[in-house]
Amino acid sequence: AERGLLPAEATIVVAQPTALDPSRAPKGKAILWIQLQELPRDGQLRGDAAGRIEVPADGRWTPQVRDAYADRIIDRLCHHIPNLRQVIIGRHVIGPGDLPGLNINLVDGDPYSGSCALDQFMLWRPAGSMGGQATPVKRLWHIGASTHPGPGLGGMSGYLASRAIG
């Protein structure tokens, strides 16, 4: 992602929300949720590491790039789920170019709410002087991916804030 390339073999996160909540799909059906962790941000797309998908000169995620890359991911999953293509009855693909329209905090499609460099992560998130979830405003607490301990930790910042509040 840092080089602006579509990974030839992406890190893939797969979940089945209907395994815990069958009401999320029609009876007898299921949802397969797929998340890719390391894609170039919108406007920073420079090429395809596998050399198979053409990307626009402006580096933006187009529907064509998004869908072609989704096809690559499905092809890879088919190695582990042989009948996957035959059982797909619909799909909804959201790419980095779509994310800011869904959540204003996902600037340029960055799902991590900013840099995850060492000086912007863990105790230094959002700033070393902030002291975790506390803010300079009395009784205002900061939670979410932009705060300690960072993105991808399923509500941990809210848990830490609730413990600090008592």
Locate each region found by the language model.
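C-terminal segments that line or cap access tunnels to active or ligand-binding sites in enzymes
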Residues: 1-101
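Short, surface-exposed linear patches
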Residues: 3, 35-38, 56-57, 110-115, ...
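A glycine-rich dinucleotide-binding beta-alpha-beta segment and adjacent secondary-structure elements
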Residues: 7-13, 79-148
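Surface-exposed beta-strand edges and their flanking turn/coil or helix-capping segments
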Residues: 26-29, 46-49, 103-104, 114, ...
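A conserved FAD-binding loop/helix module that cradles the flavin
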Residues: 145-166
